[in-house]
């Protein structure tokens, strides 16, 4: 029987990473709840076994319910009835299956009926579900919006809303408007207070994923007369209170099971989450960082499924009297797909572990004073998480698109036929590098860590890691790429021209990702050569190809060259 967890032992490899011990010890606060809750682990080993059981259940549901439903969901999609969004019929089956399996409220504390799982484990479950159906993964993974309410909401709000999400109610984050896409400081949905202090929301939200959810986090303008981000606050809207209707459901290229809605707020009752004026500059940034990690996991799931589809077809398809998997042009594509998958997954879980450590320490700090060592640790991992999140989202969303493209190429003409899954993967993946911040915006988020030397210091530290003897030559090649990378950064900084900086930023970003993932996959191949040695060989060569090209481009670029590129 298929299982999307046990069929891919690479996921369990990352579950057993040495840093997971620190992650789990912090998340479980040294197992303080072992006598209070029946499902609380007594030690690290017990926690890991719990995670394996949950991921095994997730893999079973994904392979045997969600994936078999995926084609019907893609064909039917959601529809509109009297101002309400109605899911595709099989989506209701998926929701029911995940609720019965206990796959809701994963990250929330047990006192609110959650499972208290680390972000790394939630990301693994997200990857597994996305491999089965990326559209449904959107609906399911938006439960992570509750993390923002947990962090910034009141205790009364936590007790009111978190148990509902843990029971399987759905969420959405209502940020985008017709005139406020990437530029969220232009949000104009109005928040006003009645005489009794009740907040009311009026206006329109657009492109809202799962927009008719049970509980919404809404970005709205609470400060009259303001036009920038400092006038925006975060609100909680409960569908039970009414006041919001769905005006339109978008007819999209892909992720058909995930409803994308235009919402009309008419005097909708809402609750302020946190403090006024901090909606965009603090709360949405936290919300978006979580969402970006979610898209990285979604991307890795589709990278895996696209590779699976391409590999299976190449093994069975024969041309010129031979299976096409034996043709160099085909196994070149497949090896690159696998290398991107393995390196991208390593980056995803590396980032998730960093997020886990700083988030757990932040949570502990709400109840007790951190030691100086813990404060230093939180500062370190906050910096690492902030640096790695835009890399994980941007690089993996691009890799998902590339793997889906190559899966179709391997299928040839059959890949262009709707009966084959690879066409759906291609359509679904296209949005990954757009929503929750385009790849260009991930570059904007990452560039300061490039120019201030953060990535370079991380990379040089990673270069100190020992690799197995048969990988040392590859590591030396990566070390030479680091020299080119440092020279490229210096060349761009010396230009002292913002337009040049912006134009070359994407190339520096790609170089960063290529080098970081080269070092990660070398580390993985040292620990598990049977799993990752081939991918390490392929990925480092692929990175070398990319970095050398970007280096030459940057070193030969002059400010006056910009004129050739302007429309």
Language model features with spans:
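C-terminal amphipathic alpha-helical interaction region
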Residues: 112, 453, 465-567
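Alpha-helix capping/hinge segments and adjacent helical runs
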Residues: 2-5, 10, 17-19, 255, ...
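A glycine-rich, basic-preceded beta-loop-alpha segment at the flavin cofactor/substrate interface
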Residues: 240, 247, 259-291, 308-325, ...
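C-terminal helix-coil-helix/basic helical segment that borders enzyme active sites and/or dimer interfaces
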Residues: 342-393, 489-503, 522, 526, ...
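Flexible glycine/proline-rich, aromatic-decorated loop/lid segments
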Residues: 191, 255-285, 413-439, 482
């Amino acid at each position: 029987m298929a299982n999307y967890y046990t069929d891919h032992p690479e996921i369990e490899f990352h579950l057993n990473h040495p840093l997971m011990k620190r992650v789990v010890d912090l998340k479980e606060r040294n197992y303080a709840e072992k006598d209070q809750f029946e499902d609380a682990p007594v030690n690290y080993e017990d926690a890991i076994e719990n995670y394996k059981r949950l991921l095994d259940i997730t893999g079973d549901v994904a392979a045997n319910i969600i994936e078999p439903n995926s084609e019907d969901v893609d064909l039917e999609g959601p529809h509109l009835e009297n101002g309400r969004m109605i899911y595709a019929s099989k989506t209701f089956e998926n929701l029911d299956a995940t609720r019965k399996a206990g796959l809701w409220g994963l990250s929330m504390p047990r006192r609110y009926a959650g499972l208290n799982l680390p972000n790394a484990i939630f990301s693994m479950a997200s990857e597994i579900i996305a491999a089965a159906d990326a559209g449904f993964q959107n609906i399911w993974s938006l439960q992570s919006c509750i993390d923002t309410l947990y962090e910034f909401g009141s205790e009364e709000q936590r007790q009111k809303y978190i148990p509902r999400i843990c029971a399987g109610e759905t969420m959405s984050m209502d940020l985008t408007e017709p005139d406020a896409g990437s530029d969220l400081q232009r949000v104009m949905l109005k928040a006003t207070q009645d005489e009794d202090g009740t907040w009311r929301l009026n206006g329109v939200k657009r492109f809202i994923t799962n927009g008719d959810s049970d509980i919404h986090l809404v970005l709205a303008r609470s400060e009259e007369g303001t036009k920038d981000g400092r006038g925006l606050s975060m609100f909680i809207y409960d569908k039970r209170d009414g006041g919001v209707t769905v005006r339109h459901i978008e007819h999209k290229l892909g992720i058909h099971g995930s409803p994308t809605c235009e919402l009309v707020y008419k005097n909708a009752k809402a609750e302020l989450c946190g403090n006024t004026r901090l909606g965009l500059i603090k709360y949405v940034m936290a919300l978006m960082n979580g969402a970006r990690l979610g898209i990285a996991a979604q991307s890795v799931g589709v990278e895996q499924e696209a590779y699976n589809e391409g590999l299976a077809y190449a093994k069975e398809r024969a041309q010129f009297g031979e299976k096409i998997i034996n043709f160099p042009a085909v196994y070149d594509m497949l090896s690159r797909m696998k290398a991107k998958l393995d390196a991208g997954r390593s980056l995803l879980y590396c980032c998730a572990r960093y997020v886990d450590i700083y988030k757990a320490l932040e949570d502990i700090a709400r109840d007790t004073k951190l030691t100086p060592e813990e404060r230093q640790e939180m500062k370190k991992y906050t910096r690492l998480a902030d640096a790695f999140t835009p890399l994980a989202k941007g690089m993996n969303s691009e890799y998902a698109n590339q793997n889906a493209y190559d899966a179709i190429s391997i299928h040839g003409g059959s890949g262009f036929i709707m009966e084959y899954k690879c066409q759906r993967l291609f359509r679904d993946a296209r949005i990954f590098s757009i929503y929750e911040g385009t790849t260009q915006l991930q570059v904007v988020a990452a560039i300061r860590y490039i120019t201030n030397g953060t990535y370079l210091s991380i990379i040089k530290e990673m270069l100190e890691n020992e690799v197995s003897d048969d990988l040392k030559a590859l590591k030396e090649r990566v070390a030479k790429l680091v020299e080119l990378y440092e020279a490229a950064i210096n060349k761009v900084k010396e230009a002292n021209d913002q337009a040049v900086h912006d134009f070359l930023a994407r190339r520096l970003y790609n170089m960063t990702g290529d080098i970081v993932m080269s070092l990660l996959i070398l580390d993985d191949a040292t620990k598990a050569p049977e799993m990752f040695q081939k991918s390490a060989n392929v990925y480092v060569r692929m990175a070398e190809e990319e970095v050398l090209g970007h280096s030459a481009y940057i070193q030969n670029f002059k400010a006056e060259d910009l004129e050739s590129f302007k429309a």
